[in-house]
Amino acid sequence: MRSLTIRRPDDWHLHLRDGAMLEGVIGDTSRHFARAIIMPNLVPPVVTTADAEAYRQRILAAVPKGDRFEPLMTLYLTEQTSPDDVEEGKTTGLITAVKLYPAGATTNSHGGVRDLDKAMPVLERMAKIGLPLCVHGEVTTPEVDIFDREAVFIDTVLDPLRRRLPELKVTMEHVTTSDGIDYILSADSNLAGSITTHHLIINRNAILVGGIRPHYYCLPVAKRESHRLALRRAATSGDSRFFLGTDSAPHVDPLKECGCGCAGIYTSINTMSCLAHVFEEDEALERLEAFVSLNGPAWYGLQPNDEMITLVRRDAPVAFPAKIETGAGPVTVFDPMFPIHWDVEAAIQA
């Protein structure tokens, strides 16, 4: 196959940051993606509908002229979150989901939930009104090995929560393990998972073999090869419970290349090209559209995009920049460590 035309994709997990960084990265998403669920872990975090509306306006103001892009806003769940404010956000259409960060699990998560019981009034209201909970599925207790955090979270936090509140709709974000895939597949309803571009491509060797390579460090951290292959099978299967959430997370290089570097990989600029390679390699190009354009909207109760994009397979590898320059500083672009031949040629208006 030399070309593939699909509905314009969406990104169901995206970090845009704010200020100069937002202005520097938004175009890499809006060029290809029609919508994205925007993560709320700013400093300070997006905890109220007023915060979300203000952030939404900043995002829209930064979208390059001519691009059509809709940010889908989320709230950062705290133990003080107001159920009424959450319901108002859902009613007005401002809020697409609420995000659960276990305290300390990832970048700017120190204000997250420590005692889930204190957040139950909000979760119960969300279940009642049909608002999804997006979860960063890792425990942060120091006695748990970092490579086991997801599996332990499922057993000790997520499964008990879903048994307690089975009507709550839950998105397991950036699934990284076969445990997570199997748990989603075992569920009857109200559970789905997003999968990142980079977790389909790298395993933990990318971070550790031949020296520490900080630009492959993210949270949840990449796991062993058997888990990567489980993610590949899920993503390329066409199963409607799995969809793209890039977790593209820009950090300026000095914050990555240091003694205690930040977690995050920047993939927005080359995600569609990388995914076309992955799906072609797994003989599943005909299911790429489901993963990037159809399954996510269906899960979140939205219509697929009317616009289309065309991917073309070039004879020569497509060149992507090693870094992008932003007003905040340089950001290294994800290197998949293979030649990329697929290119997004055109976005077609409906």
Curated annotation (Swiss-Prot):
It comes from the Bacteria. Its cofactor is Zn(2+). Gene3D superfamilies: Metal-dependent hydrolases (3.20.20.140). GO terms for biological process: 'de novo' pyrimidine nucleobase biosynthetic process; 'de novo' UMP biosynthetic process. It holds the Pfam family Amidohydro_1. Binds 2 Zn(2+) ions per subunit. It is an enzyme of class 3 (hydrolase). It catalyses: (S)-dihydroorotate + H2O = N-carbamoyl-L-aspartate + H(+). Substrate binds at residues 15-17, 41, 136, 219, 251, 263. Zn(2+) 1 binds at residues 13, 15, 99, 247. Its EC number is 3.5.2.3. Pathway: Pyrimidine metabolism; UMP biosynthesis via de novo pathway; (S)-dihydroorotate from bicarbonate: step 3/3. The modification N6-carboxylysine is found at residue 99. Zn(2+) 2 binds at residues 99, 136, 174. NCBIfam families: pyrC_dimer (TIGR00856). Catalyzes the reversible cyclization of carbamoyl aspartate to dihydroorotate. Homodimer. Belongs to the metallo-dependent hydrolases superfamily. DHOase family. Class II DHOase subfamily. This is Dihydroorotase. It comes from Allorhizobium ampelinum (strain ATCC BAA-846 / DSM 112012 / S4).
